[in-house]
């Protein structure tokens, strides 16, 4: 039995009912999260419970664990786990340099800026001479990402899901760039998994005909709290 599975089985009983936010659970939760990262596992409930306990018990706050939680939830994109994790961190904590670096990575992925992400990972990124430049020390980003097993693969799968809803056809050269310079074999594996059809001797992939798959749906607007606040303030 893996360390994560063993700790999770203990926590499944320990964080139920009124005992969920018992501060005595923090140490076990942190150990479980560290095992979760190293074994490339995932449990949203454990991550969210830990952040809530940090809110309720500021003396227990552990920034190193919060960084791991943010990175693990980021790996679930396009699900909203990362957004939830961000909003469970007290505003007095979010300005720390270490968390800001994580948030800058998250902002790249939330905006689907895969090209910059992979340039950072390859060491090709050159920071701008600008006060707003988020990656003044680009060499730190690969160290953060490579310490989390499966992160790069999760970004590739996220990119594939974005491609699925964005492109009808995509050139192979662009596809390779969006997936971080993968090999021809890997491109074929992703194409097979997502049902993309090679055309023009494999230089273009047909993704899907979006016009033929349009469905009526209810659209739920998701506004960030700061945007919502500014909208309300303007109308007061």
Swiss-Prot record:
What GO molecular function terms would the record report? ribosome binding; RNA binding; translation initiation factor activity
> Could you tell me where this protein is found in the cell?
Cytoplasm
Cross-referenced SUPFAM superfamilies: ARM repeat, Winged helix' DNA-binding domain
User: Which keywords fit this entry according to its UniProt record?
Assistant: Cytoplasm, Initiation factor, Protein biosynthesis
GO CC list: eukaryotic 43S preinitiation complex; eukaryotic 48S preinitiation complex; eukaryotic translation initiation factor 3 complex
What is the top-level taxon of the source organism? Eukaryota
Keyword Lipoprotein attributed? no
Ranges for domain PCI come to 42-222
Q: Name one Pfam family in it.
A: CSN8_PSD8_EIF3K
Task: List, alphabetically, the InterPro entries matched.
Answer: ARM-type_fold, CSN8_PSD8_EIF3K, eIF3k, PCI_dom, Transl_init_fac_sub12_N_euk, WH-like_DNA-bd_sf, WH_DNA-bd_sf
Example GO biological process: regulation of translational initiation
HAMAP family, alphabetized: eIF3k
**What's the subunit arrangement here?**
Component of the eukaryotic translation initiation factor 3 (eIF-3) complex.
The entry sums up its family as follows: Belongs to the eIF-3 subunit K family.
The free-text function statement in the UniProt record for this protein reads: Component of the eukaryotic translation initiation factor 3 (eIF-3) complex, which is involved in protein synthesis of a specialized repertoire of mRNAs and, together with other initiation factors, stimulates binding of mRNA and methionyl-tRNAi to the 40S ribosome. The eIF-3 complex specifically targets and initiates translation of a subset of mRNAs involved in cell proliferation.
> What protein is this chain from?
Eukaryotic translation initiation factor 3 subunit K
The uppermost taxa in this organism's lineage are: Eukaryota, Metazoa, Ecdysozoa, Nematoda, Chromadorea
């Amino acid at each position: 039995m893996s360390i994560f599975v063993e700790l999770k089985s203990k926590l499944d009983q320990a964080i139920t009912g009124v005992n969920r936010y018992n501060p005595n659970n923090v140490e076990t939760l942190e150990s479980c999260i560290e095992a979760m990262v190293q074994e490339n596992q995932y449990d949203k409930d454990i991550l969210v419970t830990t952040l809530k306990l940090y809110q309720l018990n500021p003396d227990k706050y552990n920034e190193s664990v919060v960084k791991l939680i943010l990175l693990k939830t980021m790996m679930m994109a396009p699900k909203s786990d990362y957004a939830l994790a961000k909003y469970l961190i007290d505003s007095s904590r979010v300005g720390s340099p270490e968390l800001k670096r994580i948030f800058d990575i998250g902002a790249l992925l939330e905006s689907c800026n895969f090209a910059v992400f992979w340039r950072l990972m390859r060491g090709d990124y050159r920071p701008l001479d600008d006060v707003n430049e988020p990656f003044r020390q680009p060499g730190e980003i690969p160290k953060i990402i490579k310490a989390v097993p499966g992160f790069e693969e999760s970004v590739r799968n996220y990119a594939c899901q974005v491609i699925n809803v964005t492109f009808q056809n995509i050139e192979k050269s662009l596809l390779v760039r969006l997936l971080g310079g993968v090999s021809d074999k890997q491109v074929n594996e992703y194409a097979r998994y997502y049902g993309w059809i090679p055309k023009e001797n494999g230089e273009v992939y047909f993704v899907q005909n979006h016009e033929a798959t349009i469905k009526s749906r209810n659209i739920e607007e998701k506004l960030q709290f700061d945007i919502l606040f500014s909208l309300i303030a303007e109308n007061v």
